[in-house]
Swiss-Prot record:
Lineage: Eukaryota, Viridiplantae, Streptophyta, Embryophyta, Tracheophyta
Membership in a protein family: Belongs to the protein prenyltransferase subunit alpha family.
SUPFAM superfamilies: Protein prenylyltransferase
Protein name: Protein farnesyltransferase/geranylgeranyltransferase type-1 subunit alpha
Gene Ontology MF, one: protein geranylgeranyltransferase activity
Extent of the PFTA repeats: 61-95, 96-130, 132-166, 167-200, 207-241
Catalytic activity: L-cysteinyl-[protein] + (2E,6E)-farnesyl diphosphate = S-(2E,6E)-farnesyl-L-cysteinyl-[protein] + diphosphate; geranylgeranyl diphosphate + L-cysteinyl-[protein] = S-geranylgeranyl-L-cysteinyl-[protein] + diphosphate
UniProt cross-references to PANTHER family, sorted A to Z: PROTEIN FARNESYLTRANSFERASE ALPHA SUBUNIT/RAB GERANYLGERANYL TRANSFERASE ALPHA SUBUNIT, PROTEIN FARNESYLTRANSFERASE_GERANYLGERANYLTRANSFERASE TYPE-1 SUBUNIT ALPHA
Necessary cofactors: Mg(2+)
Assembly, per entry: Heterodimer of FTA and FTB (farnesyltransferase). Heterodimer of an alpha and a beta subunit.
Organism: Pisum sativum (Garden pea)
Superkingdom of origin: Eukaryota
Length: 333
């Protein structure tokens, strides 16, 4: 058995009163002769850990020791030594790891951001192998439905994909998450992970065209979403020439600029384009001039300087950055 942490406090029998523990002498915690600020542990916690130290130092690989680790984890799920000893017990006793996985899921229900739990679950999944894939993906999906930015869940999910498989439906899953919340930067990050790492999609170059179309549509719907703009830029990683020459990127910027609202990232993207060999055409110049007149800033013959000046006004949080960008322009030097 994997042990049960779901014991009602009123029903718990102290270890010292349990017949099966009568032969064990608990080992108290040694804080030294004169502890300055000793921790005021509860009586239950102190007793469980005293007995745990006894079986741990005795290297007792027994069923009762396994049950004791469950109690200790129920009191402190972050104790690395307890989890480590539990793994030794599981292997020695040849415990059914499907049962252990259920135990971990119960513990995680109230401690989902505890690193030790995820480390242990990964160990269990690794032991079970590919058969654990679906349950692990479903487990992370359950966690992410409550907390879409849960770091440990995303990290575990990526580990499962890379080690146990399951790539086939992952891009669709990312699309589902983005359909629910287009601002979910974790879903954008996972989408990029999938198109660049999946062995079934062909890599970034093979996916670029369709992903650009997907991202352009997302940006048009919510141009104020920084995540989608960053994703678009990431689709041209190490391909800056392709990026600045892609007609879809420039036409997207122009379309957003003409709306005169939520154009911050379109404008910063245009600055990146204009800083390259590409010079904005008349349509872009007209759109920038309209924005300049809208916010009443000084006219400049160089469009890149004008863009920086506009960004200084519409993006005050990063005003120092835009001032620096302007100072780096050849025309401002």
């Amino acid at each position: 058995m994997a042990g049960n942490i779901e014991v009602e406090e009123d029903d718990r029998v102290p270890l010292r009163l349990r017949p099966e523990w009568s032969d064990v002498t608990p080992i108290p915690q040694d804080d030294g002769p004169s502890p300055v600020v000793p921790i005021n542990y509860s009586e239950e916690f102190s007793e469980v850990m005293d007995y745990f130290r006894a079986v741990y130092f005795a290297k007792e690989l027994s069923s009762r020791a396994l049950a004791l680790t469950a109690e200790a984890i129920g009191l402190n799920a972050g104790n690395y030594t307890v989890w480590h000893f539990r793994r030794l017990l599981l292997e020695s006793l040849k415990v059914d790891l499907h049962v252990e996985r259920e135990f971990v899921e119960r513990v995680a229900s109230g401690n989902s951001k505890n690193y030790q739990i995820w480390h242990h679950r990964r160990w269990v999944a690794e032991k079970l192998g590919p058969e654990a894939r679906n349950s692990e993906l479903e487990f992370t999906k359950k966690i992410l439905s409550v907390d879409a930015k849960h770091y440990h869940a995303w990290s575990h999910r990526q580990w499962v994909l890379q080690n146990l498989g399951g790539w086939e439906d992952e891009l669709s899953y990312c699309s589902e998450l983005l359909a629910e919340d287009i601002f979910n930067n974790s879903a954008w990050n996972q989408r990029y992970f999938v198109i660049t790492r999946s062995p079934v999609l062909g890599g970034l170059k093979a996916m670029r065209e369709s992903e650009v179309l997907f991202t352009v549509e997302a940006i048009i719907s919510y141009p104020e979403n920084e995540s989608s703009w960053r994703y678009l830029r990431g689709l041209f990683k190490d391909e800056s020439t392709l990026y600045v020459n892609d007609a879809q990127v420039s036409s997207l910027c122009l379309k957003i600029l003409k709306t005169k609202s939520n154009y911050l990232f379109a404008l910063s993207t245009l600055l990146d384009l204009s800083a390259s060999v590409i010079q904005p055409n008349e349509d872009f110049r007209d759109a920038i001039e309209a924005l300049r007149l809208q916010i009443l800033i000084k006219q400049d013959s160089d469009i890149a300087i004008t863009i920086c000046s506009i960004l200084e006004q519409v993006d005050p949080i990063r005003v120092n950055y835009w001032v620096w960008r302007k100072s780096r322009l050849p025309q401002a030097a």
